[in-house]
């Protein structure tokens, strides 16, 4: 059975039914990664939010999203809450908006763990320190006792990765996870994701073709809510078929992040 199957996904907003995603289809198995590239407004992030069940109430969603054969479209919110952070997780673009500025890091990571793993295995605090260390954070106890503003951008992004992976989800959605980082830190975070996502199904959303090339073999190009081209990323870079893909490649800085 395919782990994630998206078929003819359509997302429309408001009374005028403005189309954000139009007929998107793809499949992912465990260990597979699909990069989705396109400019702002192309429907990349909306696709992720539809999978995660976090679209606003005025969104009209149709088609099919199946996780291990279970239909997610129309799933009651109480059931979706049990999936988020446990079977499906997301690494967001901007840590300072994803993290609570008034709460220490250890508590934030710990709450994600406690929601789904209360009473299981080692104490929550031990799991928090283990994951902070695993994502490459130096001095995990100190960082766990810190507030988000006391950390660097790279440290905050690593915290988000720890939060997304701590419950060992089968599907990870990465929404522009390195956009706010400088090139050196970006490379370090991409190397970390390459390692940690190896056994999971994952979507990697970005406007940056060079970044997607570093972590994905397959890529889908989105424009105006539709997938206009899909295939092996190196083949698409060498011989793009769609005019929009050609423009993206012409604008890309493919030498900044080497595979």
Predicted regions and their residues:
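ABC ATPase NBD coupling module
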Residues: 56, 72-89, 107, 115, ...
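Conserved ABC transporter NBD signature motif
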Residues: 60-71
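Conserved ABC ATPase signature
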Residues: 146-151, 155
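A short, proline-enriched helix->beta-strand linker immediately N-terminal to the Walker B motif
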Residues: 166-170, 199
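Helical segment within the ABC ATPase nucleotide-binding domain
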Residues: 187-199
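A short, surface-exposed alpha-helical micro-motif characterized by mixed small hydrophobic
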Residues: 212-214
